[in-house]
Amino acid sequence: MTTTTTATTAKAPAPGETVLDARGVTMRFGGLTAVRSVDLTVKSGEIVGLIGPNGAGKTTFFNCLTGLYIPTEGEVRYKGQVLPPKSFKVTAAGIARTFQNIRLFSNMTVLENVLVGRHTRTKEGLWSALLRGPGFHKAEAASRARALELLEFVGLAAKADHLARNLPYGEQRKLEIARALASEPGLLLLDEPTAGMNPQETRATEELVFAIRDMGIAILVIEHDMRFIMNLCDRVAVLVQGQKLIEGDGPTVQRDERVIAAYLGEPFEGEPGEAEAAEVAAAEEAADAAAEADAETDADAEADAEADAEADAEAEADAGTSGAEADAESDADADADGDTDRTTDPTTTAEASGAKGSGKENDS
């Protein structure tokens, strides 16, 4: 089914348990501080906005929450448990995210992209995949069914077999959200989900986010579209120069003079200059590159491990086959030797007969 919830009729459910609890999160790159002592909580069924001028540290904070960066100070808890400093483990724990720049597998189909998001919820391992037994086929069918449900949910079911690169921009954004939902998260982080969208696409995204909220999923969203944020969010936190300036409901935040000054460009005391801001941006880019390299290394190591396991399985199978063939050949040789022993050689028989005849003549 496609989403039909609207912003004007959507009613937020009562917030449930605390899903995200970030305390004193600080991120430094060398001597530069991009995020400074930020506290933030998000409850299930709640939508929280994170806003601020460019370079305020919003995406850096997201990266600290999702394991792409390891915070210099502070801790991040998900449902009371401290999150491990690896992005794939954070995803497995129950946190999913989208990115500012769309990151889809462009040469894969829409359905295949969503199936990629299911891997953290698939219990079948390497051996099950190699043997392709009943358990593997059952899990594969369940993943496919769930992926199709999610495509229906975001309105892309009719394009399941299309290549991702052929989708319009707005639909690619929806696909990225569907892939994030495929991991069955308890917390969804959206980084500028309406960037580059027209008003109609923005409205559709708003409805989609409300529908996700109604599923009981907590949502933390970064966005520059203030109308979108104020319509959508139960609470809004403002970051300026890496620090949380204020947190509250939409009207309270909009009236705050410090927020107005930040967006109008009025300087704050101790505000970094352009050179320092450029250094922070360069440090973040270097950290992103290092994080991506680590992710690729982890993926390569996992692929090598799978290849080694597959090679061991093939070697074991070959050894079993060779051993069986050797045993069969040995048994055949033994049978042949037995038959030879039981078969009387004609020459030997003749000699034996002659000896017997000679004995009779001598007796005579």
Regions found by a protein language model. Give the residues of each.
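Glycine-rich phosphate-binding loops of nucleotide-dependent enzymes
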Residues: 2-284
